[in-house]
C-alpha cells in the first residue's frame, strides 16, 4: 500500500484549489480530483483535502479524516477591543425579531448569505429557528486581510478587500495587520485550532484594527498569499484523523458521513478519481 501523501479536490476546483494543487505537485504529492463515489479507500490514512463543506464532509467521513473548525462563538467571546463592535451568538429565531439593522450570518457554513439587514423579517423562513447565527452591529472596513495561522503564528497573509471591493495584494513582512493578528492569536491561545484562518480589517470610522471573522483553512481563499505556505496550513486543517493533536480534538468537525453525489458531481461523467500529473492551469 502506498504511503505517498494525497491532496484531494472537488471536480470544479477554485483558483485557490488549483494553486494549492500546483504546490502539492511540487512536493511530490499524489494530487487528485474526485468526480464521485466510490471514494478510493486506499487513500485512507494519507489524504488531505481542499474543498467546500459537502465535499469535505463526504470525503472526510469516507477516509477517516479530521477537519478543524474555529469555535462558533469565537467572535462573540472576544473583547470589544478585538472586534470593534458588539457581536453575539444567538439563534435564527431570535435574529428574526431584530427591529434595527444588524449584520447576520450563519455561525457555521453558508446556509444563507451574510449581510446587513434593516430588520429580522427578511431572514430565511425555511431554516430552523434553532439554527445558530452571529449577529453584530454593522460596521464598515476600509481594508480587510486574510491571515492563515499555523501553530500560533501567521504563516501566510494577503489583503483581500478595500472598502468592501475585492482587491487582493501580498502583505509586506512588517505590515500592521500581521502584528494585530499575532495579538489576537496570543489572546486566544488554546481557544484556536492549530490551523485556522483569521480575517482582520481596519474600521473605516476609527482606523482601528478589528477581527472580521474566523474561517476553516480547508476552504478559505488564499487570495495573494504564498500558496506553499497556505498549503502547510490546509494540510494541518484537513488530514488523517490518527494524526490529530490532542489540543486540536475540541475543534475537530463532526463529519456527517454524507453520501451525496451532488457534492462531488462534475460536468464530466462520474467515475474513478483522476490523477493530476502536472500542475493545473489556474483560471478564475
Spell out what each predicted region is.
Residues 136, 198, 212:
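Active-site flanking residues adjacent to catalytic metal/cofactor-binding acidic residues
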Residues 161-209, 230-233, 237-238, 242, ...:
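A long amphipathic alpha-helix within ATP-dependent nucleotide-binding catalytic cores
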